[in-house]
């Protein structure tokens, strides 16, 4: 306060005001700051005062032959004075307007080819349908998603070589185009762009969009294929969603889908062969998707799906160690465990042989309508934070986490016999038996779990065994979060094939 009074006092003296408004800035440090280096220190200000000048643009002398000195209104378009320090002409912004209206029109045949991804986007939006807007709490999970529809799947390095070859064919520098996709793309693009007048740099940028998959880690609720991600800002907010059906597919989404289907078929066939690993690798090498060898696609494609991960692991590529259980994708974010067989008794005195995970671990659980963070120790749930669209979705997540925790009170809550079978009439493994049992009726599980009083934490509330929210009590270790829970993004160690096969059929 004292400082402000002092400043006010100074400003009221006319001499101060004069010094501040009239004195030139000639302090060396300030001049250095604003004049050293090529980088503009205050671009907005520079633009403002440049545009306030009569001739802020400089152009090649040839412009004087192509543009009249004055426009129809008699305004001067360029100055007869040369630009200081170069032999260029000083030009008015009005010259740009004149050129846009009256300048020569070049052939537009290359535009749809260069700006292909934009033209395709416009078509998808034109033919897409936007449905009603619903207001509800959105559960968004950050996921790695593909943000530019319609691209090929070249690595950044491969694409760079293709772009250099297409756009700057005469530049020096070793470029080795080896893969089929590189060669076909180069040939195709060279033919398309013959006689193209668009600036090479722009062409290079556009080709990059077309050739390389760009991914971002974005909060998403709903469709994650690139044709949904391009309209993310239109389809979901914090408390609303708008239904949307894309007006067309993009080839990269088709490739992702085909890759998943192919990988599943290959894994299924490899499992029953005499040498699963060898046969899986052989099939990956001999399969083509959209004319590109599957092994090449696997190297570039970040799709995370069990069968795809198995194929990647077999090839020795890095994968993220996630697995599915009860319709949720579990991703371990910290901790570790060892597996050990253990026999346990259910509430019906039936003996189950389960694989117990010994050790402290933290997981993110990601499902269609709910997400959660789970912290567990050996056969003990320490903490579960759930976020979901509705009561039903939250209950599903809690059941899966309780079964996954392998706690004794969960196993003792079993009433009746466990005899669930799959579609091929084979008995399910014990963990899935337990899951099915409680998915049918979780009442005993929730009642048996135990409750505790809770502290008031912002954004968190408790949940009682009958699924009603509470601010005082909650099932032991379980809390409901009003915000979404992020999927963890990282590529962990390579899982050997035989291990990942077990991992993917079931986490236990």
Swiss-Prot record:
Disulfide bonds: none annotated. The keyword DNA repair does not apply. GO terms for cellular component: host cell cytosol; host cell mitochondrion. Keywords: Host cytoplasm, Host mitochondrion. The keyword Kinase does not apply. It comes from the Viruses. InterPro entries: Flu_PB2_2nd, Flu_PB2_CAP-bd, Flu_PB2_middle, Flu_PB2_N, PB2_helical. It is found in: Host mitochondrion; Host cytoplasm, Host cytosol. May participate in the inhibition of type I interferon induction through inhibition of the host mitochondrial antiviral signaling protein MAVS. The knockout of PB2-S1 has no detectable effects on laboratory infected mice. This is PB2-S1. It comes from Influenza A virus (strain A/Wilson-Smith/1933 H1N1) (Influenza A virus (strain A/WS/1933 H1N1)). The lineage of its organism: Viruses, Riboviria, Orthornavirae, Negarnaviricota, Polyploviricotina.
